[in-house]
């Protein structure tokens, strides 16, 4: 099964001011991401407020991304839902569209507390799209599924034929690396924390990853990997430190989903508000964040259109 090389973006979902999904910006969005070195998108995930979209909206978004995606631009669809039947519908739909792959995080409800429960959940979704690579999206801060991922790989091995790997959005570089080394790298371990790309590269990983701050800082994050490959360690270190500075700023403004989406507006690409219950930034907060970003010369280094 093909492994992903390079960084995949987790895009925001564009909304009109009234909260309806806005499909219009997606073509320009895809072109911008590719221009800045991103290799594809992982849509309808946490950055895209996927759990706050209807099934029909998620399908429309998938259709639009597929329709306008540049050549060789990978489309991976997050199909996770609290309703397994809806997840299977989304997986079947994604396969019919001919996307590159699908993925799912554990549901926020009901809480999954055992590996066998998680395996069964993944198995039923993956079987609805047997022709597509399936990635488990490990982000326990969102759903409480603090389960050992090496045990998951051992449990799915030989049981879920199209299980491709894990989008690993957690703090344990030790566990990430142990999963990466399992059976000489059998599974694709996609690094999911933009703040630690460089240390992951030092372990031999991060050949592929999925990020959220790649929406606006993708050029610099791609540059970390390029500098590492070229042996330019100091450049890679500087770019990683800059990425952490950007992340420190958005952490002052409710993180990537809220603060990051507003950065897109400051860059001239307004993707609209967040859906309730997210608390949108005020105009005063926006101006304060802009000043913090200007202080680190963000707008001279951010993604270009």
Regions found by a protein language model. Give the residues of each.
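Alpha-helical structural signal in soluble globular domains
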Residues: 36, 60, 64-69, 93-97, ...
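Short secondary-structure capping/turn micro-motifs that flank functional sites
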Residues: 49-50, 110-111, 172, 198, ...
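C-terminal alpha-helical cap/extension of soluble enzyme domains
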Residues: 3, 8-12, 36, 205, ...
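Residues within well-ordered alpha-helices
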Residues: 29, 90, 196-197, 260, ...
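Generic alpha-helical structural signal
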Residues: 27, 59, 63, 88, ...
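Catalytic alpha/beta core domains of metabolic enzymes, predominantly
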Residues: 126-132, 140-244, 250-251
């Amino acid at each position: 099964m093909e492994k992903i090389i390079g960084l995949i973006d987790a895009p925001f979902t564009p909304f009109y001011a009234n909260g309806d999904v806005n499909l219009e910006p997606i073509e320009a969005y895809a072109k911008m991401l590719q221009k800045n070195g991103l290799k594809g998108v992982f849509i309808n995930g946490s950055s895209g407020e996927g759990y706050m979209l209807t099934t029909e909206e998620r399908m429309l978004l998938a259709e639009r991304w597929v329709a306008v995606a540049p050549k060789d631009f990978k489309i991976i669809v997050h199909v996770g839902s609290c309703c397994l039947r809806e997840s299977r519908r989304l997986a079947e739909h994604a396969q019919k569209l001919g996307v590159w792959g699908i993925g799912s995080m554990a549901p926020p409800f009901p809480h999954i507390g055992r590996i066998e429960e998680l395996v069964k959940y993944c198995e039923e979704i993956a079987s609805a799209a047997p022709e597509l690579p399936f990635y488990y999206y490990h982000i326990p801060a969102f759903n409480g599924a603090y389960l050992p991922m090496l045990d998951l790989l051992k449990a799915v091995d030989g049981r879920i034929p199209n299980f491709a790997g894990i989008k690993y959005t957690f703090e344990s570089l030790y566990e990430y690396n142990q999963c990466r080394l399992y059976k000489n790298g059998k599974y694709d371990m996609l690094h999911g924390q933009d703040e630690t790309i460089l240390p992951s590269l030092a372990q031999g990983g991060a050949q592929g990853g999925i990020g959220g701050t790649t929406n606006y800082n993708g050029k610099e994050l791609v540059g970390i990997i390029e500098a590492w490959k070229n042996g330019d360690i100091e450049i890679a270190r500087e770019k990683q430190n800059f990425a952490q500075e950007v992340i420190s700023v958005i952490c002052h403004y409710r993180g990537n989903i809220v603060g990051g989406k507003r950065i897109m507006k400051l860059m001239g690409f307004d993707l609209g508000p967040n859906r309730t219950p997210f608390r949108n930034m005020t105009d005063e907060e926006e101006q304060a964040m802009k000043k913090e970003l200007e202080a680190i010369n963000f707008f001279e280094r951010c993604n270009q259109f």
